[in-house]
């Protein structure tokens, strides 16, 4: 994925799990001892590194204010606990020289308490998790529409596409490259957001 994005000059938004405790990931994939070195390289390239939850563990069956799934690390969790998780997650990223400006939750689910926790415990004011036709500003946050699954031509000014490279097949990479070949000039980084 990194090589493909570099080839077309794409500076992606990458979700970083501060302290991955998701057994579906930790029991399936070997821990990468060079992970934090990779994040430093991505940051050096101008990639945007986002806070992607805290532990990536689902503790509720709620969808919150973006109910695209009925499981969450955040939605339905008390404010004090969410503040603790946001603070801890940001501290872990900062310890690796990452100052997150963007948040997106595991399974894209969060609630009003998540927004309060982000305001009180971080400088994050951009959320890349919403169903909308355009970027909008509400309650002190910019919300960027997010489309799961695959890239496709959409009538929106700005949208993020959600990919999990560890789950992609060869044909998924081929489809992405075909799309990027013809449309890479339409991609923008988070820094370009106006």
Regions found by a protein language model. Name each.
Residues 73-145:
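Catalytic domains of cell-wall/extracellular-matrix polysaccharide-remodeling enzymes
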Residues 39-77:
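A basic- and aromatic-enriched beta-loop-alpha substructure that forms the phosphate/nucleotide-
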Residues 9-16, 126, 167-194:
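C-terminal domain-boundary segment and adjacent tail
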Residues 137-175:
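A conserved mid-domain beta-alpha-beta active-site/ligand-binding segment of alpha/beta enzyme cores
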Residues 17-19, 54-56, 131-133, 147-149, ...:
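Active-site beta-loop-alpha junctions enriched in small/polar residues
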Residues 19-35, 57, 61, 79, ...:
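Acidic-and-aromatic substrate-binding clefts and catalytic sites of carbohydrate-active enzymes
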Residues 1-45, 181:
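Active-site beta->alpha N-cap acidic-glycine motif
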Residues 12-14, 49-52, 100-103, 126-128, ...:
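Hydrophobic faces of well-ordered beta-strands that scaffold small-molecule active sites
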């Amino acid at each position: 994925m990194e090589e493909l994005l570099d080839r077309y000059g794409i500076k992606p938004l990458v979700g970083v799990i501060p302290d991955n405790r998701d057994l579906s990931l930790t029991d399936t994939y070997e821990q990468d001892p060079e992970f934090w070195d990779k994040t430093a390289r991505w940051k050096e390239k101008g990639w945007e590194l986002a806070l992607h939850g805290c532990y990536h563990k689902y503790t509720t069956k709620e969808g919150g204010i973006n109910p695209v799934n009925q499981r969450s690390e955040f939605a339905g969790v008390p404010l004090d606990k969410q503040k603790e998780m946001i603070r801890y997650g940001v501290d872990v990223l900062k310890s690796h020289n990452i100052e997150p400006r963007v948040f997106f939750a595991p399974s894209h689910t969060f609630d009003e308490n998540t927004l309060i926790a982000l305001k009180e415990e971080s400088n994050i004011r951009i959320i890349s998790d919403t169903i909308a036709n355009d970027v909008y500003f509400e309650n002190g946050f910019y919300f960027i529409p997010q489309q799961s699954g695959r890239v496709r031509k959409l009538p929106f000014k700005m949208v993020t596409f959600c990919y999990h490279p560890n789950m992609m097949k060869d044909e998924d990479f081929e489809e992405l490259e075909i799309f990027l070949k013809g449309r890479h000039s339409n991609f923008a980084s988070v820094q370009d957001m106006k």
